[in-house]
């Protein structure tokens, strides 16, 4: 399996991503041809890749040279541009997912509906090219899984169309929710909204370098030259024989023997609402021969403290154990399939690109039960029979 590791030791931006992909083998002419499919007037921009050095390390710098006056675009305009282009479906999907994440973050920050989001910096031609260019690069390089290191937050302030904002900018901070970050780095903006959106939308797993046989390394340079370290993004391209995806998680545990069982159900609901990957309750026989409950929560690393606090606030627990763990998971996607009962979402589980099973989503089956007046078991059987092997 071909994998790509984003080593964001100094940060990440869209132009740095494309530059590093060029070093990995993405031909600039291929990038130009594919970007032309967007329908942007060729006279309004020019692509350039130049060799540079950052703190003595050779790298490439990608630049989109544009006319000074750039129109600002609504999210709907950009989505329509991508959808109406002749780009490959896989490229469209990646680009749409990235822009969708940015639009959701902007909508949250500005308190508006996503359809009303108006892009400033991200809506300019250079940002559109950075995002679509990254999608083109991943497709050209044949990347099957994207791994991402913890992201440096940076510090200080930046000037934007909305005025002077703290680092990370509000939209960037929103995009970083749920991702591992750290503050052990100097001042300045280290992660741009475009860079954050690329890894947030397309990252398979976040954490340490995955096991692989390294085939190639590319360095993409940012425009600034930081004093504390080279302003570079390192992309590591490799092959892995593993057909399973590797993921780093945290396991939270606590023992409870003095809580109303009805409240445990509410605790489980709240934990899932806040991003827990799984929650289980197991019976225990505790000290003084009391029956109790072992609460076990599997969570993304970035959610550890938030969910631990939730356990302490919504239960009688006065302490929570935690330990890091790794898991191997089969690839899974949620897809919509057409059945005699109507369209239904199913979970498609694959192993090394081979179909393993198609599993009906419970909430979808419950919806169809209410709509069709059929028993839940019958709905399950119909959906399983009609989507098997599709």
Curated annotation (Swiss-Prot):
Q: Give the top-rank taxon of the lineage listed in the UniProt record for this protein.
A: Bacteria
One of this protein's Pfam families, by short name?
Answer: Ni_insertion
Q: Which InterPro entries match?
A: Ni_insertion
The answer to keyword Transmembrane helix applying to this record is no
User: What terms describe the molecular function in GO for this protein?
Assistant: lyase activity; nickel cation binding
Q: Which UniProt keywords apply?
A: Nickel
Under the heading PANTHER family, the entry gives:
NICKEL INSERTION PROTEIN-RELATED, PYRIDINIUM-3,5-BISTHIOCARBOXYLIC ACID MONONUCLEOTIDE NICKEL INSERTION PROTEIN
Similarity field: Belongs to the LarC family.
Name this polypeptide is given: Putative nickel insertion protein
Gene source species: Geotalea daltonii (strain DSM 22248 / JCM 15807 / FRC-32) (Geobacter daltonii)
């Amino acid at each position: 399996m071909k994998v790509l590791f984003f080593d964001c030791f100094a940060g990440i931006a869209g132009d740095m991503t494309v530059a590093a992909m060029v070093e990995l083998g993405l031909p600039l002419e291929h990038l130009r041809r594919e970007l032309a499919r967007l329908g942007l007037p060729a006279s309004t921009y020019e692509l350039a890749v130049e060799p540079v050095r950052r703190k003595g390390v050779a790298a490439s710098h990608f630049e989109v040279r544009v006319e000074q006056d750039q129109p600002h675009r609504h999210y709907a305009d950009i989505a329509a541009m991508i959808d109406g282009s002749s780009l490959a479906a896989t490229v469209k999907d990646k680009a749409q997912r990235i822009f969708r994440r940015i639009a959701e973050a902007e909508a949250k920050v500005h308190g508006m509906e996503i359809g009303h989001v108006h892009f400033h910096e991200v809506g300019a031609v250079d940002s559109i090219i950075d995002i679509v260019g990254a999608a083109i690069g991943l497709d050209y390089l044949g990347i099957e899984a994207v791994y991402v290191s913890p992201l440096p937050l940076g510090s200080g302030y930046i000037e934007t169309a909305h005025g002077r904002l703290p680092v990370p900018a509000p939209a960037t901070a929103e995009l970083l929710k749920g991702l591992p970050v750290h503050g052990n780095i100097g001042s300045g903006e280290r992660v741009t909204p475009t860079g954050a959106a690329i890894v947030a939308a397309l990252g398979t797993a976040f954490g340490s370098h995955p096991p692989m046989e390294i085939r190639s390394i590319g360095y993409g340079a940012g425009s600034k030259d930081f004093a504390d370290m080279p302003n570079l993004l390192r992309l590591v391209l490799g092959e892995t024989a593993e057909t399973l995806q590797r993921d780093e998680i945290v396991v939270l545990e606590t023992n409870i023997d003095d809580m109303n069982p009805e409240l445990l159900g509410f605790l489980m609901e709240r934990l899932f609402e806040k991003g827990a990957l799984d929650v289980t309750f197991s019976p225990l026989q505790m000290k003084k021969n009391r029956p109790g409950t072992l609460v076990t929560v599997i969570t993304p690393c970035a959610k550890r403290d938030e969910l631990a606090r939730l356990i302490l606030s919504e239960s009688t627990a006065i302490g929570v154990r935690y330990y890091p763990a790794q898991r191997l998971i089969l690839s899974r996607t949620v897809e919509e399939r057409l059945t005699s009962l109507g369209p239904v979402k199913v979970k498609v589980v694959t192993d090394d690109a081979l179909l393993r099973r198609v599993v009906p989503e419970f909430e979808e089956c419950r919806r169809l039960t209410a709509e069709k007046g059929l028993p839940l078991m019958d709905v399950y059987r119909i959906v399983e029979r009609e989507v098997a092997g599709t």
